Design a protein with these regions (language model features):
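Short, solvent-exposed coil/turn segments at beta-strand boundaries
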Residues: 85, 102-110, 122-128, 143-148, ...
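A structural detector for short beta-strand units
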Residues: 98-101, 117-119, 138-140, 157-161, ...
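Residue-level recognition of conserved beta-strand positions in structured domain cores
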Residues: 113-114, 153-155, 162, 173
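Mid-chain, well-packed structural core segment of small domains
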Residues: 138, 149-150
Length: 193
């Protein structure tokens, strides 16, 4: 990662709480985003495997409307040790209160869609190179460790952790620790924070 990319990403990270307060993200308006798909009991019984779907990337200029589900129709069960993080989540506690993200999972694959970007990773697979915060190019590897999804910058430095604690999703991103609740319906059915 180039020094300019690091400075750009660091500056964007420090300003993220202010950006979210000034421009609160909108939750997906269509109900299909909120449905948690049924997974097959075993990998052998799965009709579609996670690697049957092409890898998604952040589109040029980022997305402004929630993109379709990347793993729609995939029923491959989660790999052993993977926490079930699937769903649409909103931060209700922490510096990034209001943040909304959609997490899709199947097999070892996890797709995190939020803030105009799409991170499509395979835990234990090759690192993903895509756009990060502030437009900086990032190289990130995913690993399931101790019931957590950990993301490593350049496959070395742990920078993001997601795990379940009761019904909450705990998301640590850089210096920020946030608690998220699962949204089960489009915005008109969810109480404001």
């Amino acid at each position: 990662m180039k020094l300019g990319h690091i400075a750009k990403a660091f500056g964007a990270m420090l300003l993220a709480p202010l950006r979210i307060r000034r421009h609160p993200p909108e939750a997906p308006s269509d109900s299909f985003h909120y449905a948690i798909p049924m997974l097959a009991a075993t990998k052998d019984l799965a009709v579609t495997q996670a690697n049957d779907f092409p890898v998604a990337k952040t589109s040029q200029g980022r997305w402004t409307e929630w993109p379709p589900l990347i793993l729609a129709g995939c029923d491959e069960p989660l790999v052993e040790g993977a926490p079930d993080l699937r769903g649409v989540w909103q931060a209700y506690k922490g510096p990034l209160r209001g943040h909304i993200e959609r997490v899709e999972q199947a097999g070892a694959r996890v797709v995190i869609t939020a803030g105009g970007i799409i991170h499509d990773l395979t835990a234990g697979g090759i690192p993903m190179t895509d756009e990060g915060l502030g437009g900086a190019e990032i190289n990130v590897a995913a690993r399931y460790e101790d019931g957590r999804l950990n993301l490593y910058l350049n496959n070395k430095r742990l920078v993001v952790t997601r795990y379940r604690e009761g019904s909450d999703l705990v998301w640590r991103w850089g210096p920020y620790r946030n608690r998220l609740r699962r949204l089960n319906d489009p915005p008109k059915n969810n109480p404001p924070l």
